[in-house]
């Protein structure tokens, strides 16, 4: 029988590093993230699970869905794997997710 457990304590040990190098890595990481992700809008992050052998964002983009919108929910024009909030309701997001899944399945034969 599988038991449900809750982790209440974790110890993490990180290797030592040079402060300047670590800060430069952090700045570079944040720059790359800002280039690729729609950080100026509220979103729940990457929305669709990666299908085997493909990338959800690439499939969504190839189906011409970047910028698609239902109500206040929109497929990001910057990264098609993100649904951004432009004043949408939960119903808007659920409808947009279902629309994206239908279109990708029809055009690509892949379930997101």
Model-identified regions with their sequence ranges:
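Phosphate/pyrophosphate- and phosphate-bearing ligand-binding catalytic cores of soluble enzymes
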Residues: 1-95, 102-107, 111-112
């Amino acid at each position: 029988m599988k038991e449900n457990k809750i982790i209440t304590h974790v110890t993490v040990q990180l290797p030592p590093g040079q402060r300047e190098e670590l800060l430069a890595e952090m700045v570079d990481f944040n720059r790359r993230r800002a280039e690729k992700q729609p950080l100026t809008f509220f979103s729940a992050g990457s929305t669709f699970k990666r299908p085997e052998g493909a990338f959800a964002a690439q499939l969504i983009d190839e189906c011409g869905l970047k910028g698609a919108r239902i109500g206040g929910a929109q497929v990001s024009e910057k990264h098609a794997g993100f649904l951004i909030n432009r004043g949408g309701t939960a119903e808007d997001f659920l409808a947009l997710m279902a629309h994206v899944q239908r279109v990708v399945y029809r055009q690509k034969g892949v379930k997101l």
